[in-house]
Amino acid sequence: PYFILMKTLGLLNTSIGLIFAYSVTALPLCVWMLKGYFDTIPRELEEAARIDGCTQFQVFWKIIIPLSLPAIAVTALFSFLAAWNEFLLALTFNTSNDNYTLPVGLASFISPTKQLWGDFAALSIIAAIPIVFLFIIFQKYLINGLTAGSVKG
């Protein structure tokens, strides 16, 4: 049904189609992770801000979001990793070589007629470099965010 939907909407072999597919698959994980964290934020903080004269948007923007940065960073990183490493949807929704994603392109180095293991290994290392940089940049949020929302009370 997913392939038929993408074909009907004209989203096969397009970047927009992959963005749509990755967003739809990442959304449940993001909602589940962030809900667990938002449940741990005390309601008293929101109520105190409302008493001090903040609007609902100000409460969200100035109190909830800053407190939620670790959870948002972890959720964003997990979603990015899922899309970065995803193979099956990219292979299914892209039938031309022009729109291959990194994992599908890497898989093309190994076939029954040729095995370019050296090239495959080198490109795998190069593909890991952006992930390593992201983990270094978000390290302080990751340490706090991985356990955030796991224990309530």
Feature-to-residue mapping (PLM):
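A structural signal for multi-pass alpha-helical bundles of membrane permease subunits
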Residues: 1-153
